[in-house]
Amino acid sequence: MKRLNKLVLYISFLILVISFTAGCGIGKEAEVKKSFEKTLSMYPIKNLEDLYDKEGYRDDEFDKNDKGTWIIGSEMVVQPKGERMKSKGMVLYMNRNTKTTTGKYIVSETLHDEDGRPKSKDKEYPVKMVDNKIIPTKGIKDENIKKEIENFKFFAQYGSFKDLSKYKDGDISYNPEVPSYSAKYQLTNDDYNVKQLRKRYKIPTNKAPKLLLKGSGDLKGSSVGYKDIEFTFVEKKGENTFFTDSLHLEPSEDK
């Protein structure tokens, strides 16, 4: 009888531990989603100049007279099997104090030196935004690059995360010492955002991507750190296809 009672107590304890662990996982997943929700709920931002009038997270790092600078970036990275990794993307710095925007369009290719070590070869094209149009600030001979810049759209302009709750049973990671956190979800090719990416980019795989929400800093909010989203289609040695996007407010350098 004593053995039976001990067995019952042991099983009850295991159930309690499993329930507690599962509860913590669900709670942390909700926290990660909430940390991204304020920014992602603004998507799509069709007119980027609307960001001049949008508030972001502020803390003691900001001067009281500083409205902050929005930093927005999108990049597509493709490496077919056995080939070089190539990427194209853009980053803009949108100063809310002066309502001016500058940035750069970046074309990158990963090469290898004589010892086989990877080395990135980047070409940067300075840009500015006027009347919601992105234009080069220097002459560009390559007409294809010029068109890519003029037609460039950030994911924040067409992506949609109106209902983060639809993403469930994610792979959650949290390290309070760094601190860093992430949530990963398997998507389908029927997902709205996946369709939008395939519409705009030549993605050399039919595999449905995983959505990764990753960040660093205080989960409740911080101007120090980052919050990125990534759509990973392929991730293996010598073959990669992924898209990254970020939007966050930082203290302005002119303050």
Curated annotation (Swiss-Prot):
Membrane-protein topology: Lipid-anchor
Highest taxon of source: Bacteria
Main location: membrane
Lipidation (S-diacylglycerol cysteine): 24
Location(s) in or outside the cell: Cell membrane
GO cellular component: plasma membrane
Signal peptide boundaries: 1-23
Lipidation (N-palmitoyl cysteine): 24
Recorded family membership: Belongs to the staphylococcal tandem lipoprotein family.
Protein name: Uncharacterized lipoprotein SAOUHSC_00055
